[in-house]
Amino acid sequence: MHNSSRKTQLLNSPQNLTIATTGASGAIFLRHLLSLVDRDSRVRIVNLVSSDSALRVIAEELNLRGRTNLVGQLLGRASRKVHQQSNADIGANIASGSYPSDAMIVLPCSVGTLARIANGIASHLIERAADVCLKEKRPLVLCVRETPLNKIHIRNMYRAADAGATIFPLIPAYYFRPATLDQMAHEFSCRVLAHIGLPQKDAYRWKGETRKSGFNSV
């Protein structure tokens, strides 16, 4: 990459991120996403918000306990970059459009959170921060985790997308033949970050295939 292109990429890369996690299964994906942004030198600030339901899911899936030091528990180390916010603090910095948050990721995003965001119900910080992203035309990525989907879920995804959000379902890739759940979570997190302008150097990239089987693609 030429120096000028690299400088342009650095200038355009989001430096101030909001990451929210809600009460849908998939806490391991959050852990990998946080680890990636914590080590990414392009990212300067990360505001992390978790719902009460998310804390329960994290406790059950990752065997972590308590509301305090959630960042340290998820990362396994202290972080100067990632700051935990209370979902009850509706007056936090990320609740205002004047605060320079560059993008927001909700991972995983429950269908309840999706419904509130899609319909402009902002009674907690997560929904308010998402509402701010929509009104300020900032990237908002909703990693919805639910199956099967009913008509209400689908309509809410359409409504959120129509308002400006990206619906990024929590569906991992299989074509790179992951051997572990950690590999799947890592690659999914890399794709989410690439979507907002933070491509990761160690992300898997499909290079096409050399047909040896003799079968034609359908």
Can you describe what each PLM-predicted range is?
Residues 2-140, 148-218:
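A cross-family phosphate/adenosyl-ligand binding-site feature
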